């Protein structure tokens, strides 16, 4: 498949933010709405870099973007999935900061301007913001927490791992890239990146609107897809647990919390997908072999502690097998 790169004119100064926008078979008006939400920000053309990665769409959107082609970098590549597309964007990006934006989503201007002010005036390494599936503007004055280290944030908060949920300094990356070929790459990438942040600001500003995805992306009724998602989550757990022994104590405690909560997610998914005691016991055996079961009964949250206590005994597992499918319907 041919590629069609189109580069913005060189302006000399480094862009403040590189926006990486993967797209695949999206309606052009939806992609355009996403790009317009970036171009409508207070950033000048010199301060922003918009990188559109077309992951092998059947019909290229390039012709429909002709009027903004001088404001974007467009790369077309064979379809290899979101992780490869994002890695391609990271390889091109020149901005001081990186923001991922899925091609069917958009930024919320009022909230995102607050994030831009945070990196301009506080020199934050990372800004974690709120997202919404409802079309709205941020309301009222934003409330911030921090700056704090990424390790401190992970130790005391439930992580929202979606890579479009934060703005981060590009220099944090080093050689960190997305794990290609799996479906849960965000879960592996985000905690490792966050541990590298020394100055993290958490804001309640709603800065991102995401569309709830249905159909082929979710593959909700495909048993093979469900099995793959479970296997991929085990792969993520393997990667993160392998990192634990290399970390200093505070970082290890931070990542351990994330591992424990992902282990809970794995078990909840088994119950939700299969409603089968046999499949659950098989999953517990896989976790036991990895040293991840029995679950540690730490008080990360009331929900986690209750779940861990119940999952660690036979009677509790029976209750969870019956109750969880009712809760998540």
Question: PLM ranges: what are they?
Answer:
Residues 15-18, 37, 49, 188:
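Cell-envelope/extracellular polymer assembly enzymes that use nucleotide-activated donors
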Residues 35-78:
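Acidic donor-binding segment of Leloir-type glycosyltransferases
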Residues 2-5, 26-41:
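Short, well-formed alpha-helical segments that are part of the catalytic scaffolds
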Residues 62, 77-93, 100:
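Glycine-rich, basic loop-to-helix element that forms the pyrophosphate-binding segment
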Residues 14, 93-96, 109, 124:
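Active-site acidic short loop of glycosyltransferases
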Residues 82-83, 102-202, 210-227:
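Donor-binding/catalytic cores of nucleotide-activated saccharide
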Residues 207-214, 220-250, 269, 273-292:
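Catalytic core of nucleotide-sugar-dependent glycosyltransferases
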